[in-house]
Amino acid sequence: MHNRSQGFFFSSCHPQNHVSYGCQSPSFIFCRCQSLNFVSRTCYPLSYFSYGNQTIGSISNSFRSLNYVSHSFQPISFMHSSFQPACSDFVGWQSPFLRRTC
């Protein structure tokens, strides 16, 4: 179970999965993702919104010890470029209300 949620969250942090998952959470997280510095901190609430109270403790721990996550989020700048189009694309079939915010 521990391994599963960790592995699951790993992919969640990857650009592609991140987009599809992020669109499900409040879109305001996207806007916050604009500042690269904040992204590191956004990672915590993002996990909270996505997972609610399922395994927040384990995730929080994972993210704190996963120093690489910070590095992994650096290329988010490239993701940011394809963020708006990708987001509106994903949201298109995900939820029209979110598209308005994106």
UniProtKB/Swiss-Prot annotation:
Keywords attached to this entry: Keratin, Repeat
Entry superkingdom: Eukaryota
Disulphide-bonded residues: none
GO MF, any single term: structural molecule activity
A GO cellular-component term linked to this record: cytosol
Annotated family: Belongs to the PMG family.
Function, in words: In the hair cortex, hair keratin intermediate filaments are embedded in an interfilamentous matrix, consisting of hair keratin-associated proteins (KRTAP), which are essential for the formation of a rigid and resistant hair shaft through their extensive disulfide bond cross-linking with abundant cysteine residues of hair keratins. The matrix proteins include the high-sulfur and high-glycine-tyrosine keratins.
Assembly mode: Interacts with hair keratins.
Protein name, entry field: Keratin-associated protein 25-1
Native source organism of the sequence: Homo sapiens (Human)
